[in-house]
Structure formats: structure tokens, C-alpha cells
């Protein structure tokens, strides 16, 4: 097969310039932190967060670079606490909305049809928010996503334990999508929402 692959890659590392352009403006003045500034740059901390989200590993299993003394340059708990703080402040949602806004501004979104579907991700080594899916025969996390026709994710994932029915998750996902659409000025007039057959029945 020749030519470039059509699928999209998941970013696992940002350059400092990319971080300052796309992420830093959404972290807020002071980043919601009291006390001395972190010894490790926010850029490097953010890249560690991207890495653990991509790998799907436990935080304590995150590979961390060594400093000049041969010690980990940061403890994994500090990365985790930073991530949770940014979540609580709404920074992660703001970063996501900013990326969707950029896709819209660059005319890279096709909102004629919005696709919604769910999947179960395996978590063989444990983790948070897990449940056993009898249908999939695995223990993991249930995820529902909404995408445009180019497979751009245009609403934050809604997750639950793997044994949960997907229908209630869609009920939670649609308001979050509507919130982002209003925030960035999406024009959804005439848009068709296409859902997996599991959503045809009543919410259960």
C-alpha cells in the first residue's frame, strides 16, 4: 500500500512551542497553585500526563526520566496531583474546546453527520472505574465518544465501568457536546446524529 495513512495519530508529546501556543493559555494565571513554583516545567509535566493517558498504565508505572543525580526528576504523585488540579479547574476541558475551535476555524470539521458510539477498553492490570463486561468478556472501562465525519472527536469522552449500559452514557455525552458547540459557535443546523443501534431502545 502506498501513500500516507489516513488515520490520525494520538499525540504523546508536545514541543515547547506547541505547549505554549495550545495548552498554556488554558491553564489560568498561577495555575491554581499555592506555594513555590514547580522545579519541573509545566511543559514537561504535561507531556508526562499525555504519556500516561496514551499508555493507559497506572501512574506509579509511568517511566520518568532521571536527573543529573540519577534520581527521578519528579515523583509520579506530583504529576497526578497536577493533572487532578487541572481537571478540577476546568483546564483540561478548556484545552479540549480550544482544539475543537481550531479545527472549526481551519475548516477541518464536517458536521453534516455526527457519529456516536461506545467501546470497552481492556484494563488487564487494573485501574480506576473498572467493571466486567459480560458481552465483551473482559474487565475494563466503557467509553462513549461523538465524532464528526472525519473522525475528529468533538466532545469529551464519557466513561464508566465496563459493565455499564452505554445508553445512559450517551445521555451524559450529548449535553457536554452541546456545551462545547455553544462555547465555540458551532453551526449545527441540519446536522444528523448517527448512533449505534444500542441507543435505539429506552434508557436502561
Where does each model-flagged region fall?
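Short alpha-helical elements
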Residues: 1-204
Amino acid at each position: 500500500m502506498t501513500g500516507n495513512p489516513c488515520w490520525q495519530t494520538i499525540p504523546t508529546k508536545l514541543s515547547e512551542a506547541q505547549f505554549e501556543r495550545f495548552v498554556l493559555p488554558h491553564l489560568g494565571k498561577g495555575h491554581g497553585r499555592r506555594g513555590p513554583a514547580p522545579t519541573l516545567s509545566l511543559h514537561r509535566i504535561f507531556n508526562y500526563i499525555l504519556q500516561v493517558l496514551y499508555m493507559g498504565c497506572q501512574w506509579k508505572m509511568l517511566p520518568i526520566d532521571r536527573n543529573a543525580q540519577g534520581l527521578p526528576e519528579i515523583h509520579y504523585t506530583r504529576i497526578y496531583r497536577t493533572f487532578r488540579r487541572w481537571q478540577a479547574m476546568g483546564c483540561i476541558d478548556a484545552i479540549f474546546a480550544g482544539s475543537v475551535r481550531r479545527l472549526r476555524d481551519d475548516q477541518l470539521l464536517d458536521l453534516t453527520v455526527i457519529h456516536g458510539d461506545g467501546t470497552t477498553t481492556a484494563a488487564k492490570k487494573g485501574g480506576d472505574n473498572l467493571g466486567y463486561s459480560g458481552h465483551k468478556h473482559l474487565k475494563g472501562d466503557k467509553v462513549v465518544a461523538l465524532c464528526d465525519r472525519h473522525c475528529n472527536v468533538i466532545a469529551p469522552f464519557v466513561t464508566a465501568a465496563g459493565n455499564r449500559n452505554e445508553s445512559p452514557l450517551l445521555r451524559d455525552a450529548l449535553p457536554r457536546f452541546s456545551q462545547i458547540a455553544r462555547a465555540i459557535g458551532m453551526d449545527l443546523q441540519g446536522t444528523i446524529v448517527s448512533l449505534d443501534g444500542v441507543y435505539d431502545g429506552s434508557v436502561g
